[in-house]
Amino acid sequence: MVFDIEMIKKVYSSMKDKVDHAKKICNHPLTLSEKILYSHLWNNLDKPFLRGVDYVDFAPDRIACQDATAQMALLQFMQAGKSKVAVPTTVHCDHLIQARIGAGPDLQEAINTSNEVFNFLESVSNKYGIGFWKPGAGIIHQVVLENYAFPGGMMIGTDSHTVNAGGLGMVAIGVGGADAVDVMAGMAWELKFPKLIGVKLTGKLSGWTAAKDVILKVAGILTVKGGTGAIIEYFGPGAENLSCTGKGTICNMGAEVGATTSTFGYDKSMEKYLRATGRDEIADEANKIKDYLTGDPEVYENPEKYFDQVIEINLSELEPHINGPFSPDIATPVSKMAETLEKNNWPRKIEWGLIGSCTNSSYEDLSRASSIADQALNKNLSTKAFFGINPGSEQVRYTAERDGFLDIFEKLDAKVFTNACGPCIGQWAREGADKQEKNSIIHSFNRNFAKRADGNPNTHAFVASPEIVAAIAISGDLGFNPETDSLVNNLGKEVKLEEPTGWELPPKGFEVDDRGYIEPDEDGSNVEVVINPESKRLEKLEPFVPWDGKNITGAKLLIKAFGKCTTDHISMAGPWLRYRGHLDNISNNCLIGAVNAYNKKTNFIKSQLNGEYGGVPEIQREYKKNNISTVVVGDHNYGEGSSREHAAMEPRHLGVRVVIVKSFARIHETNLKKQGMLALTFDNESDYDLIQEDDTFNFIDLKNFSSGNQITIELVHSDGSKDIIKTNHTYNSQQIEWYREGSALNLIKKGA
C-alpha cells in the first residue's frame, strides 16, 4: 500500500468538527474550498479570514516533488538538521527523460546520462523516509492521482501542476522547494487566504467536446492572470457528469490562469476512480463524510453570494477549442480556427501532433484518442503530421497496451515515448528545430510559451484535447474541423471522422507489472548520501548572506524585461534541466530568455562597467565580482508558469538584490521572498517607463522595511537627472524575517 490510510482516516475523523466550528465562526455556509482550508489550519480558528488579505498558516497532509525541482528542495532539506520528513512525501522521476527515439531507448539514455542525479534522489529519499518513484514510473501528477490524492485533503508539490489533484477533490497547490522544505521540516506552510471563483457547469459533454475544452474556455475568459490569488471551484450538474480524470485535466490547467488551485466536490465519478485504482478503503471513508467533501447546498444555490466571481458554462453548448499560439489563453473555437489562422497569418500546416503530459495522459485520454486513430486506419487515412504519445504512468501504459491502444497508435506510425513529461517541458530532441523555421504543432499539454517545447522561437504551439489533436494530426491541417469537414483517404475517397468514443475507466480493470515504486527504509540513519565535489550536476548549497539592515545604494539596472517574462524566460528548462541540482552551473541560464526592453533582443544587455553588450549571466557575474548590487525590472504577471525556485535562486546567487515589476505571479513572488530577495511592485505602473538603460537605484527608506509600508527609490539617470518612484510590497512580519536572515532556510537552521 503506497498511500497512508491512517493519515487519511485522521484527516477525516477531525474534519466534521473543524468544518462545523468554521461555519459557526464564519456565520455562513461554506464552499468546498473553505471547508478544506479551514480544516487544515495550523492553529485553532478564532476568527474568519479575509480573502486575498490575511496570511494564514496551514498544515498540508502530504508533499510531492518531481526530479528537477526535488534536487534543490532536498539539498535545502539536508541543511535543515532533521532526520526524517514530518509529513508523507514522494519524489517522482519524470522531468529528466528526453523524448527522441521511443520509450525504451529514451529511458535507457536518461538513466545513462542522469544516473548520478537519480541515485542522489533515491538515496536522499531512502535516508529521510521519502517514497521514490523510479524513472519511467510515470508523470508525477498522474501517479499522484492514481495513488495519493484523496477528497478533502490538502497537499503541496514542487511543481505548478500539483493542482491536478483537485480532480479528486483536494486542495493541491504548487510551491517552490523552500515552501516544501518548511513542511518537510515540520513547520507550518503560509499562504494568503485565497479569493474564490465559482464555475457553475450545466449540461453534458457530447460529440467532439471534451473536459479539456472547459478549461480552454475558462482560460479565454480569465486570461493568464485572471485567477491569480484565487481558488477556482467547479460545481453544478455538469460537474457531476465529468469523469474524475476529466476533472483532473480541468484543474491541471488552472495553473495557466494563475489560480492558486482548482477543485471539485466529491461525487460518484471520484468514488469510481478510487475503487478502480485499488483504494476502496478511502472511498468507504469518504462516503461516511461525503456532505463535508463538497460545498454546502446554500452556496451552490446562490453562488454569487459566496464566491468573489462566478462563471457559468453549459457543457451541452460548449464547442471544442484550440488555444494559442504562444499563450494558453488565446481561445478559439474549432469552428472559427480556419478564419482565425488566415487573419493572423499563423502557419496552417501541422508538423506534429503530441498527446500526453500531466494534463491529458490518462487511460480515458488514450482510449478516446485511439478511437480516432483506429478510424483513420479503418478508413485508409494516413497521418499528415508526425504523431507522438506520452502515457501518464506505467499503470496507464501497461493497461493501454493490454487493451490494444498503443498498437493502434503504432500502426499509424506514432512514436510512443516514455511515461514522462517529454516535449511538454522542452525535453524533446525534435529533428530540425535548430533551423528555427516558422511552423505549427498541436498538443494536449498545458503550456505553449515560445520555445517551450522544442527551443524554436518560431514554433507556433496550439493546445487542444487529445481527440482534437489526433484529428488535426491526421488531417495535417490546423484549420480542419472534424465536426463538419471531410478528408480524402489513400484511395482517393472522401471520408469523415466520426465522434470519438472511449472508456472513462478500463472495463477489465487497471493492470501493471512493476509500477516503479521504492519504499524507503524504516530507519535511514545509516544511509549515506554522497555528492562528488567535482560534479557538474550536483552541488552542496552555501547559505545566502543576511541583509545588513542598510539601504541599498548604487545598484545598477541589470535588465528591464519587455512583455511576457515567465519562469521559462528566467530559468529555461530543456537542456538546462541537467543542472537543476547545481546552482552555480544552472545560473548560466539566468534571464537568457527575457527580452531586453531597449533593443528587443534576448540575452543581450548593456554593462554599466564598460558600456559593452553581452549575455545576462556573464555581465551579472562581473557586477558580483565588483560587489555591485543589481536590479531586475519587469512587466505584468512576472514569473508566471512553472513553480521552479531556480528562477529566484539564480539571480540571488549571482548577486541580484531586487526585482521590481508591475505585478507578480503568486508562486514566483513567494519564491523570491523565500530566497531573501526584495520583490516590489510599482505604485504607479507608468514608472516602468521612467527606467533607463544606464540607471542607478538608491533605496531611500529600505532600512525602515516593515509590513504595509512603501519603499521609495531614487532613480539616477546617466545625464545626472533624477526621478523618485514609490514601490509596494506584500511582505508580512515573518517574511521580513526571511529577508533579514538572508533566506527562509537560514531562519529554519537558526531555529533547528
Spans of features found by a protein language model:
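Flexible inter-domain linker/hinge segments
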Residues: 5, 16-21, 36-42, 46, ...
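Extracellular/luminal Protease-associated
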Residues: 235-240, 624-664
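Long, structured ligand/cofactor-binding scaffold of large enzymes
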Residues: 8-11, 15, 20-195, 569, ...
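Accessory "access/gating" subregions that flank catalytic or transport cores
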Residues: 108-112, 117, 122-157, 233-236, ...
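Mobile "lid/hinge" segments at catalytic clefts and subdomain interfaces of large enzymes
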Residues: 3-4, 67, 150-284, 381, ...
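Conserved, function-defining core regions and hallmark residues within catalytic/recognition domains
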Residues: 512-628, 632-633
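Acidic, glycine-rich flexible loop/linker segments
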Residues: 487-504, 668-738, 745-748
